[in-house]
């Protein structure tokens, strides 16, 4: 199992480009099932989760090629197998995103109940209940979801709770449904807007993405398109925190700052100096001058749960005390035990982590438990005294493209160790 070796103490400086957003790309890849025509993707990140989705589509009969411009071209016109098998689905919860597309276009889907990060319960009930309202028949058999429908029929759906993948799955199902579908209490994440823009570029009729209500007028078919994956706001936020905690000066290019206001506002409160350009963000911070900032996660436009672990590290290095509250997922403080092994002073009580700033950390062997926990351990290693070895880094490869290369380019002493 590969590991990352980090020797802390180096200030990060320089400019790097942000990769395409995994959380935007995955539903778009699932949506390629909705058309017979070719889809071309630019700026698709090279990540394990993307590879897993490729494997799922490929196992169904999709054709995936790479052109001379490094764009991915996908054709699902020859799909003949409508099953997403457990051996592929078990590593990634987003695998369920193929459910809506398969039922909408082919009338049948057999999807293994999903796996992914072990950060709490993320039920698929919202997906299944909404598909049932659209006219699908749902059965759970031997760990698989089986969905059938002759033709989905538009209707009003009020989600009982906010679900990003639930919103995306039903959007994809509804674009080919007969009549109008109105989705209420939907997720407002930028990636939901990205999916709507992508589907509309294929000929869908979707309005309201980014608000509490999405209106979808079904169409008979969708066409091919060319689409560039927007920048990953969570990757960008992670590198900005890395710059802040090392007392660095880093510029990120290919980034959309308006999507990151909730992150940037907290970084400013922590003492960072931030300059925003048309498609870039520059952050500088004096080492040792971090101010504590309370964090409370919430669905967009609130503070993203996917940045909670990174800001826990920032607060651990601050001058003062703070409270980090996790409102989105339970059991998402598994990184705390490992951070405390490096010298952090963090106490978890229920959904709150009480963080006392310690000023400095010490390198140690640590083990990643999920994607964002992996990122927090790497961040801690960047500013710790001595050597940190991060084990089980397959988690980080699910969501960060070439993280050791990008950090090395900025001046970090970080090396990937082979098995």
Model-derived regions, located:
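Short, structured segments at the rim of ligand-binding sites
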Residues: 1-419
């Amino acid at each position: 199992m590969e590991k990352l070796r980090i020797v802390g103490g180096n200030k990060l400086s320089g400019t790097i480009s942000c990769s395409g957003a995994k959380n935007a790309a995955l539903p778009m890849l699932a949506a390629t099932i909705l058309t017979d025509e070719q889809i071309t993707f630019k700026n698709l990140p090279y990540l394990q989760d993307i590879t897993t989705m490729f494997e799922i589509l490929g196992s169904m009969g999709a054709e995936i090629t790479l052109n001379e411009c490094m764009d991915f071209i996908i054709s699902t016109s020859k799909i003949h197998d409508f099953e997403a098998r457990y051996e592929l689905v078990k590593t990634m919860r987003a695998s369920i995103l193929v459910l809506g597309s398969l039922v909408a276009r082919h009338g049948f889907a057999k999807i293994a109940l999903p796996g992914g990060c072990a950060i709490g319960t993320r039920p698929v009930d919202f997906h299944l209940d909404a598909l049932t309202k659209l006219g699908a028949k749902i059965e759970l058999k031997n760990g698989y979801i089986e969905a059938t429908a002759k033709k989905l029929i538009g209707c009003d759906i009020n989600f009982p709770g906010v679900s990003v993948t639930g919103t995306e799955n039903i959007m994809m199902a509804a674009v080919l449904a007969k009549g109008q579908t109105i989705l209420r209490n939907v997720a407002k994440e930028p990636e939901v807007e990205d999916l709507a823009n992508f589907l509309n570029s294929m000929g869908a009729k979707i309005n309201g993405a980014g608000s509490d209500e999405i209106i979808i007028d079904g169409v008979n078919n969708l066409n091919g398109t060319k689409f560039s994956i927007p920048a990953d706001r969570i990757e960008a936020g992670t590198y900005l925190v890395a710059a802040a905690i090392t007392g660095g000066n880093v510029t990120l290019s290919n980034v959309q700052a308006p999507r990151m206001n909730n992150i940037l506002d907290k970084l400013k409160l922590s003492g960072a100096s931030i300059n925003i350009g048309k498609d870039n963000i520059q952050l500088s911070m004096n080492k040792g001058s971090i101010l504590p900032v309370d964090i409370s996660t919430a669905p967009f436009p609130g503070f993203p749960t996917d940045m909670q672990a990174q800001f826990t590290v920032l607060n651990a290095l601050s001058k003062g005390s703070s409270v980090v509250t996790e409102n989105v997922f339970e059991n998402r403080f598994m990184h705390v035990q490992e951070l405390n092994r490096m010298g952090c002073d963090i106490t978890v009580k229920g959904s709150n982590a009480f963080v006392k700033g310690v000023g400095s950390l010490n390198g140690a062997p640590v083990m990643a438990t999920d994607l964002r926990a992996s990122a927090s351990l790497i961040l801690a290693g960047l500013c710790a005294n001595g050597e940190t070895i991060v084990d089980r880094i397959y988690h980080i490869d699910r969501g960060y493209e070439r993280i050791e290369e990008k950090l090395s380019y900025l001046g970090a002493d970080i090396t990937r160790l082979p098995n």
